[in-house]
Amino acid sequence: MEQYRGTTILSIRRGNQVVIGGDGQVSLGNTIMKGNARKVRRLYKNQVIAGFAGGTADAFTLFERFEAKLESHGGQLVRAAVELAKDWRTDRALRRLEALLAVADKEASLIITGNGDVIQPEDDLIAIGSGGAFAQSAARALLDNTELSAREIVQKGLTIAGDICIYTNHNQTIEELEY
């Protein structure tokens, strides 16, 4: 059975802000099933922000598991991410889940993959999903050549991705943390 998929998630850390934003489109094959999905949310007492790309049902399962890991590890983002990645890699049921998570708190920005990888990207710039390469290119140019805030860069990067990627729309959800 074909999965619901396609999205763009972009995260930027600049100054005393970290921002994660995502579009709202859910596609099944070449059909838009929903245009206002919420793929970015706050977790663990509003201290962590997270976004997902990939299968929608899979991502919600992973959000629940990740939040449980955050609870059991006192909100320690890196430790919770590593523990989730271990489970994701070794648990038979979880291993079939197809999604990527972008997570951030006041100290770190991470990508968690189903291969068991926990990646802290260069420059604290994360771009995942079908429009990720477009959003990343736009964000990198804006980071290097402007003084825009993290939120403004996320908004512009997602807009550019939505202009180019057929699986990304302009209905944006953006969450930010200040520290």
UniProtKB/Swiss-Prot annotation:
One GO cellular component term: proteasome core complex
Signal peptide: none
Top-rank lineage group of the source organism: Bacteria
InterPro entries in UniProt: ATP-dep_Prtase_HsIV_su (IPR022281), Ntn_hydrolases_N (IPR029055), Proteasome_sua/b (IPR001353), Proteasome_suB-type (IPR023333)
Entry keywords, A to Z: Allosteric enzyme, Cytoplasm, Hydrolase, Metal-binding, Protease, Sodium, Threonine protease
Xref: PROSITE patterns: PROTEASOME_BETA_2
Enzyme class, UniProt record, top EC level: hydrolase
Predominant place of localization: cytoplasm
GO aspect biological process, one term: proteolysis involved in protein catabolic process
Residue numbers annotated as active site: T7
Regulation: Allosterically activated by HslU binding.
Binding site for Na(+): G162, C165, T168
EC number from the UniProt entry: 3.4.25.2
GO molecular function annotation: metal ion binding; threonine-type endopeptidase activity
Localisation: Cytoplasm
SUPFAM superfamilies cross-referenced by the UniProt entry: N-terminal nucleophile aminohydrolases (Ntn hydrolases)
Reactions catalysed according to its record: ATP-dependent cleavage of peptide bonds with broad specificity
Mitochondrion listed as a keyword: no
Family recorded in the similarity comment: Belongs to the peptidase T1B family. HslV subfamily.
Subunit-structure text: A double ring-shaped homohexamer of HslV is capped on each side by a ring-shaped HslU homohexamer. The assembly of the HslU/HslV complex is dependent on binding of ATP.
HAMAP family noted in UniProt: HslV
Function field: Protease subunit of a proteasome-like degradation complex believed to be a general protein degrading machinery.
Protein name: ATP-dependent protease subunit HslV
Gene responsible for this protein: hslV
